[in-house]
Amino acid sequence: MSRCPVKGFLFEMVKTSSNVLFTQLKRAAIVALCLFVFCEWLIYYLVIYQCSWPELHSEGREGRFDPLRIMLLTDTHLLGPKHGHWFDKLRREWQMERAFQTAVAHFKPDVVFLLGDLFDEGLYSNDEEWDFYVQRFHKMFDHSENTEFHVVVGNHDIGFHPEAARDSHLFERFSSVFDSPSVKLINIKRNIFVLVNSIALQGDDCSMCSEAMSQLHAVADKLNCYRRSKKEIFEDIVKQDRTFCELPKDSPPPILIQHFPLYRETEMSCTGVDAPPPDLKQITNREKWEVVSKEMSNTLLTLIRPRLVLSGHTHHGCYLVHEDGTPEMTIPSFSWRNRNNPSFVLSVITPERYALSKCFIPRESTVIAVYIIAGLAFVLVNFRPTYRYLKTRRTCRQITLDCCVR
């Protein structure tokens, strides 16, 4: 039997082509790994490091106060066991964890405030599911002991008023885990914060609402102690309700933090890249659902007399000034699940002044676009070598067949 004269040559061609294909596959694996690292880790540093603490312009005696640096975020909506696809849960929670950990490591805030709707299914979770929920939350939003962490409750954590009033256990377990009563007064570096449970501001006789109003008036008494007459203070001393004013006489007006925004008829006054779209701006807000009722909003402004109001709930950004001159910033959602361009707020505060700045985290559309563009570019660059390998294999197979036939 005669030997095929091109057998050795064909073998070398196939071997060379195989090496080329192996090299391409190895290169593809390296590119895929680098792309994954960039989109899932490095991009957060690249975007968040472009943000910075706002500059607090000093006036007069401003330098005598040590500025307080706070970070604010809201509406994280961790998915629960009943709703949402597992990949959706994995993707969006990884995004929030990376964004939060990157921001906290870089900015090192003194305090972090999360303005409600920590969970998406708090209302529907039994105690076992709730415990697992809380463990996931603490893992995602882990922070150093040098950073204080405070939260307020949202409607997805315990339900709107009808559900929360019907089952008091929902708010009780949230309050016990996060040390978050319906009304809480915090004094940090002489800056006063009042944290309020918006769900309890219904003005009815439910136990949660009654307790909230009692706590609200107690906090208002502390805030307005020095505004009261000497006769009123003396009467309290006699009753042993109070022996002295707890806050310093020169304490600044507080900052009010809650989940629901104060009453506003629509979102027409909201501006910015994260403001509601035009079709949503015109919709009338429902009291006790989208915003605090008009009556209770006036009560809060009268009792607390805040210098600033911070809220969440709408998933959109908004800054406005109420009729009495009180400014309010509504912070957008921190989750890709609620918007394409999530953000958080950095604030520098002293008893006399404050400054706010908004920091955006990577857009979900940007990350997806990077994956698609990089993938297509790699395929196009490597298409010709791969095509040549496949063509060589086909040619060699045909030549070998012809040689053997002869």
Predicted regions and their residues:
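Solvent-exposed loop/turn segments at secondary-structure junctions
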Residues: 76-79, 118-121, 155-159, 199-203, ...
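Loop/turn elements at helix/coil->beta-strand transitions in domains of secreted/extracellular proteins
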Residues: 40, 66-68, 108-110, 144-149, ...
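Binuclear metal-dependent phosphoesterase catalytic core
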Residues: 2-4, 9-11, 21-28, 32-57, ...
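Extended active-site neighborhood of metal-dependent phosphoesterases/phosphodiesterases
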Residues: 50-60, 123-249, 279-284, 302, ...
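Short acidic, glycine-rich surface-loop motifs adjacent to enzyme active sites
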Residues: 249-267
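Active-site-proximal beta-strand elements of phosphoester/diester hydrolases
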Residues: 67-83, 190-204, 254-259, 308, ...
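N-terminal active-site segment of His-dependent metallophosphoesterases
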Residues: 2-131, 136
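Active-site neighborhood of phospho(di)ester-bond hydrolases with catalytic His/Asp-centered motifs
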Residues: 72-74, 112-117, 148-155, 196-197, ...
